[in-house]
Amino acid sequence: NFKNKITGKCTPAKFANMANLFTSLELIKNESSDLVYFVEDDYIHTKESITEMLFTFEKLSTIFNEDVFLLPADYPYLYSKSDNTKIFLGHKKHWRLVDESLVTFLTSKKVVIENFKNLMQMATKWEDPWEKPLHEIYKKVPCFSPIPSLSMHCANINSVYGLPPNIDWKNIWDENKNYK
């Protein structure tokens, strides 16, 4: 029961997201894995997404001499600003330095533990934007988004956020429809 753990007025869907994040953060404390992938249930991934992210994590962490965040999606809304950016070569794709994301990302357990308080704030206190504590972490820990995208956030299909460009998402959907 999360009603006494989560504060602020939010929709039932946001409350469920917060409860899931809370549970995930608690589980990570006892997890032995080096890397963790927070993934919401409304993303479709390309077949190469996990492999690309794992090899790119190793490469970019080596370049920056610190662990990083990797997003599977190239969120179109991040192109609505005229900020300068930096592009790096990952395993087989280009990766763009970004300062915002939603709540699907890969990073190290170490980064999660070091930023546990800020991440737990997202799980216990509704703020708008909900991801603001995560964006604050990106000021200290580099975050990258793939070009082109490795996934699509299905909630964005009819929203101002839009679909990641240059991918045949209908084909990806068809390739994934038999996976359970």
Would you name each region that the model predicts?
Residues 1, 73-76, 144-151:
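Acidic carboxylate-rich catalytic motifs and surrounding loops in phosphoryl-/glycosyl-chemistry enzymes
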Residues 1-33:
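Active-site-proximal specificity loops/subdomain of glycosyltransferases
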Residues 7-12, 69, 143-145:
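Conserved beta-strand scaffold positions in the cores of enzyme catalytic domains, especially
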Residues 13-24, 45-49, 101, 126:
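Phosphate/oxyanion-binding active-site loops and adjacent basic polyanion-contact surfaces
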Residues 35, 44-118:
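Conserved catalytic core of nucleotide-sugar-dependent glycosyltransferases
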Residues 109-110, 114-180:
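C-terminal catalytic/acceptor-binding lobe
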